[in-house]
């Protein structure tokens, strides 16, 4: 039986900052909030367009370890979100207007980092028209 992706979870030192980035810059909508004992959010779940799975932003209790991204290094390579090929220029403009530094581009993917330093890609294939 084939498996489907349920969710991807990212631990965030600054949950509110991460949520703003994914909502305001990338346009993801909040599906659900999980409260934290003592107030605030413990976790925020964000929807992805196809409704298959979700992105969970989790409050981290400790600061991140220094882990600069490097190709070929073991660990999470990137979180890739699908965009339609005809919308690529719109996304390039949106990232620039939001002050997001694009670190690399290929024929199919725009690479950048979220506020926590996680590598994110907006990707398409040539036949995604």
Label the model's feature ranges.
Residues 43-45, 109-111:
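Conserved hydrophobic/aromatic beta-strand scaffold that supports enzyme active sites
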Residues 34-41, 129:
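Short glycine/proline-centered loop/turn elements that form peptide/ligand docking sites
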Residues 1-5, 10-32, 48-101, 113-129:
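Glyoxalase I/VOC metalloenzyme domain signal
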Residues 105-107:
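Short, small/polar residue-rich loop motifs at catalytic or cofactor-binding pockets
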Residues 36-37, 109-110, 126:
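Conserved beta-strand edge residues that scaffold enzyme active sites
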